[in-house]
A protein has these predicted regions:
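Acidic donor-binding loop of glycosyltransferase active sites
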Residues: 404, 419-436, 450
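Conserved acidic donor-binding segment of nucleotide-sugar-dependent glycosyltransferases
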Residues: 466, 470-477, 486-491
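Short hydrophobic beta-strand element within catalytic cores of glycosyltransferases
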Residues: 446-447, 451-454
């Protein structure tokens, strides 16, 4: 419990909550609550919060007393004195203040200025994750938690790979937030062809992608070690053999429980892809999917039992939801409307459809700048060089868009990537294929509170259905331009989508994801 209660209230607060002034009319408050489906609005005077108006206030102090809603001002309705909490205080402090004052919401301030709102519902979400984990933790006779050691089989930094980045965040989060449950982790790193890396010290064993004997040696190392459970990060392309079939030789030989995270689940697999994934399923005690749609595919297409499949969302960083203007200045973009897409570049990303959509967007908004962030995928670069990037550059030039498109051709450190996202007005995901079951870029865009325009690939379908993203059609520049122009022309829709994206991401932040994984590791061990 301590790991959660010691987090700052900023972890789960709603940033940029809706505000009104004390002299605004109660009718305006009611309109806003109805339009945006919100239960409270902060009252601000001279940039300082002075009260809060809730749905209960409106019912008891206006409607019940039969006041004229067109003549009643907010000052006569709001709850005061206002109870606030400083952003640096802990969730434990927030819970105590809510209980002491018998309230469900706390206005969060920094040096007296409004920075957010923390709600009972938000605290319940993080508490739910904690208690799920607590129920699985085994307490030994001396009343300490039975700590386990996990081996992670995956690519690792400094290798430039999305799976490597994901694994680093997962490992770091389990160390940071589950210290009473896990011991120092063990890394088993997947090397690409000809790739040798200066790994951090937690990497104790390495597998050369095309050397079948190195898979066997890695299994021997794991079996002889004090590792309790193995987490395998599975993506076809990081393992050797046809469709990465060498991973089965590794799994066959591991004598410890295995929890496998599936980054790709094909709904219409070719025979070799089916064979390999069926082997992974056979030799795994549990498998994790990041989108709930993956659970149905595994049961329906691969015949995997439902009890074996667990849903844990793709993790995301816990960052502040800030106005884009604050970050745009640091990039010299204060006069631009910024669209962006990030990730390792390859033809499967569909960037060309956004470029094709730009003329219709630029016609209405000539200040548009589309940022294409990320270098070409290293494996693609080995096989094809910069063919795809050059294709995109040629397309930009042929459409006369050189002033409206900028390539950031680097693998960015996380803090710089987040800054670019915070400077983004609309984040676009134009994936051309439906079968994408997980997307780190989608998770990051949600975590920074972006208004998102995305094609309905499997992971995105769930986000769209929850009102946290706007759907555009596959391979359809006209659909993309229509969605972007709609958001830019209607600030209310844009702001509502942005807030919903941020709120949706709160259950996906790394502390929650780490606890879910540790909970599953204990379950795999029968604890």
């Amino acid at each position: 419990m301590k790991e959660i209660l010691d987090l700052s209230v900023e972890t789960n607060m709603v940033t940029a909550p809706r505000t009104v002034s004390p002299l605004d009319l109660a009718s305006a408050v009611m309109d806003l609550m109805a339009k945006e489906n919100i239960g409270s609005i902060v009252v601000v005077e001279n940039n300082r919060p002075v009260g809060i108006v809730t749905g209960r206030d409106m019912l008891l102090r206006v409607l019940k007393l039969e006041k004229n809603i067109e003549l009643t001002v907010v000052r006569d309705v709001m709850s005061e004195p206002l109870v606030t909490i400083e952003a640096g205080r802990t969730i434990a402090d927030a819970l105590e203040m809510m209980q002491r004052n018998n309230i469900r919401r706390l206005v969060v301030t920094r040096k007296g200025a409004l920075v957010g709102l923390i709600t009972e519902r938000g605290l319940l979400e993080i508490a739910h994750s904690h208690y799920m984990m607590r129920g699985r933790l085994k307490v030994v006779d001396d009343h300490r938690i039975h700590r386990i050691r996990v081996a992670y089989v995956s690519t690792y930094p400094p290798r430039e790979c999305g799976i490597a980045t994901y694994t680093k965040h997962l490992v770091d989060a389990t160390i940071a937030y589950c210290t009473r449950a896990v011991m120092s982790p063990v890394g088993v790193a997947m090397n690409d062809r000809g790739g040798y890396y200066d790994y951090e010290t937690r990497v104790k064993s390495q597998i050369d992608v095309d050397d079948i004997q190195s898979y066997e040696k890695a299994a021997q190392y794991i079996n002889a070690s004090d590792v309790d459970v193995v987490n395998l990060q599975h993506e076809y392309g990081i393992f050797g053999g046809e469709w990465g079939e060498y991973v089965i030789e590794l799994l066959k030989r591991i004598e410890k429980p295995v929890v496998t995270t599936l980054h790709t689940v094909l709904e219409v697999p070719v025979p070799d892809a089916r064979r390999v994934l069926e082997g992974v399923l056979e030799y795994s005690d549990f498998v994790v999917v990041m989108a709930k749609a993956g659970m149905g595919i595994l049961e329906r297409v691969y015949g995997c039992g439902g009890d074996k499949i667990k849903h844990i969302p793709h993790g995301c960083p816990n960052v502040h939801h800030i106005e884009t203007a604050m970050t745009k200045r640091s990039f010299g973009l204060q006069d631009r409307v910024v669209l962006s897409t990030f990730g390792l570049l390859s033809s499967g990303k569909g960037i060309e459809y956004v470029i094709d959509a730009l003329p219709q967007i630029v016609k209405e908004f000539p200040e548009i700048l589309y940022l294409i962030i990320g270098e070409t995928h290293p494996e693609i670069r080995k096989r094809e060089g910069e063919t795809y990037r050059q294709f995109l550059l040629n397309l930009v030039e042929s459409l006369g868009l050189k002033k409206n498109v900028r390539f950031v051709n680097r693998f960015l450190p996380e803090n710089e990537l987040i800054s670019y996202l915070q400077a983004t007005d609309i984040y676009v995901i134009p994936y051309p294929n439906r079968e994408q079951i997980s997307s780190g870029t989608l998770s990051y865009a949600l975590s920074t509170g972006k208004a998102i325009v995305t094609t309905p690939f499997l992971h995105a379908e769930e986000v769209i259905s929850n009102g946290a993203a706007l759907k555009c059609e596959f391979k359809d520049p006209n659909s993309i331009s229509e969605c972007v122009n709609t958001l830019l022309n209607d600030k209310q829709i844009h702001q509502r989508l942005s807030r919903r994206a941020y709120e949706y991401s709160r259950t996906m932040i790394w502390p929650n994801v780490a606890m879910s994984y540790v909970n599953l590791f204990y379950h795999a061990l029968g604890l």
